[in-house]
Amino acid sequence: MNLVTSKPNVLLNPLFAQLGENRHVLVGFSGGLDSTVLLHLLVCLRQQLIPELNIRAIHIHHGLNPQADSWVKHCMQQCDQWKIELKVVRVNIDPRQNGIEAAARTARYQAFSANLAAKEVLLTAQHLDDQCETFLLALKRGSGPAGLSAMAAKMPFAHSQLLRPLLAFSREILENYAQAQQLQWIEDDSNQDDRFDRNFLRLNVLPILNQRWPHFAQATARSAGLCAEQEQLLDELLAENLQQLQGPDRSLSIDGLLQASMAKRAAILRRWLASLGAPMPSQSQLQRLWLEVAMARQDAEPQLMIGTRQVRRFRQHLYLLMPLAEITTNYLPWATVKAAPNSSIIPLLPEPLWLPADLGVLRFVSAGGQAVRPAAVGEEISVRFGLQGDIKIVGRHHSRQSKKVWQELGIPPWQRERIPLLYFGEQLIAAAGVFVTQAGQANENEPCWHLDWDKPLRLG
């Protein structure tokens, strides 16, 4: 292959600088112009400057184009020629919610994340024209500074980082480079279909803008960079506020938000949602979150969906919940208590019980957890869901209705039906991790069992 001469170092040197100390890279390789140039540059880096550079490529087969199989063949041949390991991943696209472009992108980056090795960084080949398109699409959506920041040249991704080393260079520069190096690449005919927003901009809008203002793409990139700076500044200024308003469970204080201006409150809410992995909410969603959830009447149990997450309120705090698996049974038999070896009356601890709906594991341990009386030999142990009736718990003199018990103990409504209830026969012994009933209380100076709930980090 041709080595890069001094002239194309305009591309090679920035790539070398951005790689830094990284020596393991995974490259998103479609076989098109942009990713072919990026992969070629990396191979040249390996030959000229970084012989220890480990390069892997990943090709995503979306199954959307009749030529997709031939593209795989092209990528395999190219990687074989350049002695690069290639991973081909087939994905399924569901365009029903956000359209085919967004669905394909989501599937692509999920595949990148799933295949990124421990020491690898991900490299993708977006260029200056792509950045301009991203900025204009954000402008069309009415985005604020976060959206108008467009794409970052370097950002956290999965357990590692995503680098976009070609972001400062136009497609024209990449095409000139590819022709000078006699590279071969594929052309996706769907790129000529201007029903897709990006293609519409690329084919019908940007040529006119660039003809009128030749440096339009560079100017939009500068604006995107300035928006990114503003977002970074806000992140730094609001980090302490966000930390002060969050509880140990990552819930957000409504009373604290009430002290902030509308603009500051919206900025804090966005950062709270982002810190928990929620998609960026629209202005309308933020308004609904505040008015319909935070400011709902006190006896209400308001909720709002943001993406697949649910925002709920409890005791003047906002909570962001992951999708919760449904509990399809209210009764789980655990064990019939057996006698320990060489004894007819000493009960043997049952094996751990795996709970449904991703609720974790219940087990009895030698120490720690909740101390409860031992079950008798022959007694049936079960786990149930859904607390009902009047309950007498340890430390209280009188029985209380189940709803009152949950309220007094500060358990949010959405968690109450997901807390395992331990029964010996028909006697409620304990709510795992929450309380022990008087019927389940261990007697002093007598052996007891210790109930331990190994639960997920977040119940919801």
From Swiss-Prot:
Protein name from the UniProt record: tRNA(Ile)-lysidine synthase
Protein family (similarity comment): Belongs to the tRNA(Ile)-lysidine synthase family.
Protein residues bound to ATP: 30-35
Gene3D superfamilies: 1.20.59.20, HUPs (3.40.50.620)
GO biological process: tRNA modification
Pfam family, one: TilS_C
Superkingdom of this protein's organism: Bacteria
InterPro entries per record: Lysidine-tRNA-synth_C (IPR012796), Rossmann-like_a/b/a_fold (IPR014729), TilS/TtcA_N (IPR011063), tRNA_Ile_lys_synt (IPR012094), tRNA_Ile_lys_synt_N (IPR012795), tRNA_Ile_lys_synt_subst-bd (IPR015262)
Gene Ontology CC annotation, any one: cytoplasm
Uppermost EC category: ligase
UniProt subcellular location: Cytoplasm
Function (record text): Ligates lysine onto the cytidine present at position 34 of the AUA codon-specific tRNA(Ile) that contains the anticodon CAU, in an ATP-dependent manner. Cytidine is converted to lysidine, thus changing the amino acid specificity of the tRNA from methionine to isoleucine.
Domain notes from UniProt: The N-terminal region contains the highly conserved SGGXDS motif, predicted to be a P-loop motif involved in ATP binding.
EC number: 6.3.4.19
Main location group: cytoplasm
HAMAP family according to UniProt: tRNA_Ile_lys_synt (MF_01161)
Catalysis: reaction(s): cytidine(34) in tRNA(Ile2) + L-lysine + ATP = lysidine(34) in tRNA(Ile2) + AMP + diphosphate + H(+)
